[in-house]
């Protein structure tokens, strides 16, 4: 997961969040205009006279009148929709109120669409960040929350049931609640302030609901008034969803498992090759292992499961069409959500780039840091650029340090994910370690409510599945009860993935998932909050990011002292020496040797604190050109991907020249705010 840092005002190609004013307007369709023809311009040869038509009959007159009314209605309706859409845009200037503030807050949006929040108390800054996220990204927040809670079907209908079942099975909401419970009080206060800012704005009625809410018949104002539009636990859950999106390989494990019934191990590793120059991680004959266990479905079972899957897919496809008799046109986003869900567990080909250059190797004498994200395109953008400023907390907020941090935020999270403060800059790319393992769980033939667990040699032992029933509300249909089973390893994916029954005999075996990110001690959110206050690369990587859990990231950092550093931050499991599968394919869950044995200590994950680093490839320091932002003079040049180039022949002085040119251009433009807003607590 990575992104460009704070965009420079001098760069016209800055990758930033779409300005609210640039939201696409509804198209208009003016009537065709034909040029007038003067009688003198007509041809001299007149056409034969035509008989005059009879006066229109009653039905025809009625039809013409109705068409005129309908046509006018369409024009009026289109005008009403356009006016409503404009009314739903946020008010970005003037005065507004926000419940819960201890003092006034200033919000300024600059020409690069970076939102600057200046508060007198830290929690007010976080509350204001929640407000501006709600102002500009209300539907994005609402949709994200429905995804992680598995409530899409409530508004989109049965087409989204597979996604809801998968998310409910993973237990994202339950894991988020457990992780929230383990956070320290000051972190909980920040998450609460952020959620309060979102809910207060949505409940205020300061702007009309965006069209998505109207199309789906949703009432976010009432939900926000109860504090339920966004909760502190939702921020923890959204961090989990990012870990799910960027850190998984269960799909690849299942693909190897499925392929092993048709090809031998040598061919299997040709289909799923290891890293170049490396041997396969496991030498186990997977085909022989799974045949000996008898896990695969018979042809009859596979055909039956495939037929059921095809019927379900056809139903979902039909429900997803733009057909008013079957579903709402607004259900079109579900197709992309289903594609996203189908792609979970496959991270090959995903990646990013970051570079950091020590001050001693740059012409300016200051370090350079660039971050190039390789995340999918979306509308609205996944990132929201912001700067949060506040002195240290006073009175009831005395536990909170001051803020001056700038960079890319994620709507739903109350901190800068990638960016810089007055002392240090940082960037991420995805490390992609193996933090997910699938386990074959054998079902007790005498009691299907039990599964096999490790036992002394020569003995067999069983344990009960942990179960819970999830009720999924479905638009236009009765509620669906979904039973979630879990083993000592984790949730049973086979209960939510129809493809499993097409490959394996699910009456005798199921697949359970062990995923590091679901553990209750996942405090990635805490790392993000504490990173904003780091004063050096050592504090960032050695203190704040010790809390970082999932998804593991290659973190590069630079500070005002000229130091640069790299650290693989995150939690990676250790496996026993006799674990011959090494996590590449589903393992027999009743054999203890396949269980995780612990975690790689944070001090032992890869790191470096010297020289010039590049996460994709080593390069000469002079190959990076940077545009520095005049907004914060930290001595650390934070480079946006759009303004960074790599050319081997580039002279060493190019970086300083580019900085000088960028600074001059920014001064010429004046770094003027495009919108100013003053927020205060209601009287």
Where in the sequence are the language-model features?
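Alpha/propeptide regions of enzymes that mature by internal proteolysis
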Residues: 524-546
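Short helix/loop capping segments that flank catalytic or ligand/cofactor-binding pockets
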Residues: 118, 126-127, 238-240, 365-366, ...
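Substrate-recognition/specificity elements adjacent to catalytic centers across diverse enzyme folds
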Residues: 67, 75-368, 373, 379, ...
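Compact, glycine/acidic-enriched structural inserts
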Residues: 398-480, 531, 590
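N-terminal Sec-pathway targeting helices
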Residues: 54-72
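N-terminal Lys/Arg-rich, disordered targeting/topogenic segments
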Residues: 2-59
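Hydrophobic alpha-helical segments
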Residues: 436, 493, 547-683
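Glycine- and acidic
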Residues: 177-184, 368, 520-530, 683
């Amino acid at each position: 997961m990575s992104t460009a840092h704070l965009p420079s005002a001098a760069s016209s190609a800055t990758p930033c969040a779409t300005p609210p004013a640039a939201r696409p307007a509804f198209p208009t369709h003016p009537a065709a205009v034909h040029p007038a023809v003067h009688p003198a311009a007509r041809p001299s040869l007149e056409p034969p006279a035509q008989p005059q038509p009879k006066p229109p009959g009653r039905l025809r007159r009625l039809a013409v009148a109705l068409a005129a009314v309908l046509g006018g209605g369409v024009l009026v309706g289109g005008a009403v929709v356009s006016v409503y859409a404009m009314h739903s845009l946020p008010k970005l200037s003037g005065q507004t109120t926000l419940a819960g503030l201890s003092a006034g807050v200033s919000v300024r949006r600059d020409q690069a669409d970076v939102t600057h929040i200046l508060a007198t108390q830290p929690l007010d800054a976080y509350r204001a960040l929640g407000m501006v996220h709600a102002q500009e990204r209300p539907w994005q927040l609402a949709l994200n929350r429905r995804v992680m809670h598995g409530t899409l079907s409530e508004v989109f209908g049965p087409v989204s049931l597979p996604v809801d079942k998968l998310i409910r099975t993973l237990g994202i909401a339950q894991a988020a609640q457990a992780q929230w419970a383990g956070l320290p009080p000051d972190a909980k206060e920040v998450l609460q302030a952020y959620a309060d800012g979102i809910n207060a704005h949505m409940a205020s009625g300061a702007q009309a609901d965006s069209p998505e809410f109207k199309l789906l018949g949703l009432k976010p104002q009432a939900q926000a008034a109860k504090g339920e539009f966004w909760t502190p636990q939702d921020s923890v859950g959204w961090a989990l969803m990012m870990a799910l999106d960027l850190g998984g390989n269960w799909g690849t494990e299942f693909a190897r498992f499925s392929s092993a019934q048709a090809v031998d191990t040598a061919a299997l590793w040709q289909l799923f090759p290891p890293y170049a120059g490396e041997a396969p991680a496991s030498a186990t004959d997977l085909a022989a292992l799974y045949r000996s266990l008898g896990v695969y479905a018979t042809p009859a079972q596979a055909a039956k499961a495939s037929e059921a899957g095809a019927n379900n897919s056809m139903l979902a496809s039909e429900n997803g069409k733009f057909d008013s008799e079957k579903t709402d046109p607004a259900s079109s986003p579900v197709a992309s959500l289903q594609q996203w869900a189908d792609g979970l567990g496959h991270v090959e080909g995903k990646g990013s780039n970051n570079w950091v250059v020590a001050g001693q190797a740059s012409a300016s004498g200051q370090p350079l840091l660039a971050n190039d994200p390789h995340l999918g395109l979306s509308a609205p953008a996944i990132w929201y650029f912001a700067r949060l400023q506040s002195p240290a907390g006073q009175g009831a907020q005395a536990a909170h340090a001051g803020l001056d941090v700038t960079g890319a935020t994620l709507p739903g999270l109350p901190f800068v994910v990638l960016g810089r403060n007055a002392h240090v800059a940082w960037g991420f790319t995805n490390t992609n370690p193996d933090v997910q393992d699938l386990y074959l769980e054998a079902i007790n033939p005498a009691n299907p409510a039990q599964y096999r667990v490790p036992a002394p040699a020569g003995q067999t032992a069983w344990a009960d599945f942990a179960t819970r029933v999830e009720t999924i509300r479905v638009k236009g249909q009765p509620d669906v009860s979904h039973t979630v089973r879990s083993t000592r390893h984790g949730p049973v994916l086979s209960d939510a993935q129809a493809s499993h029954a097409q490959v394996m005999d699910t009456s005798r075996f199921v697949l359970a998932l062990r995923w590091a990110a679901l553990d209750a001690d996942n405090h990635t959110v805490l790392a993000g909050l504490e990173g904003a206050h780091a004063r050096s690369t050592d504090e960032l990587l050695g203190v704040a990011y010790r809390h970082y859990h999932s998804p593991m990231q290659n973190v590069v950092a630079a500070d005002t002292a000229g130091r640069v550093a790299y650290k693989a931050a995150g939690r990676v499991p250790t496996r026993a020496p006799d674990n011959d599968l090494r996590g590449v394919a589903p393992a027999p869950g009743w054999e203890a040797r396949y269980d995780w044995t612990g975690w790689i200590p944070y001090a032992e994950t890869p790191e470096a604190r010297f020289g010039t680093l590049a996460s994709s490839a080593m390069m000469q320091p002079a190959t990076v050109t940077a545009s520095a932002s005049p907004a914060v003079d930290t001595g650390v040049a934070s480079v946006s991907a759009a303004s960074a180039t790599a050319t081997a022949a580039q002279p060493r002085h190019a970086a300083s020249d580019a900085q000088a040119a960028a600074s001059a251009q920014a001064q010429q433009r004046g770094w003027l705010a495009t919108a100013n807003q003053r927020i205060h607590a209601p009287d």
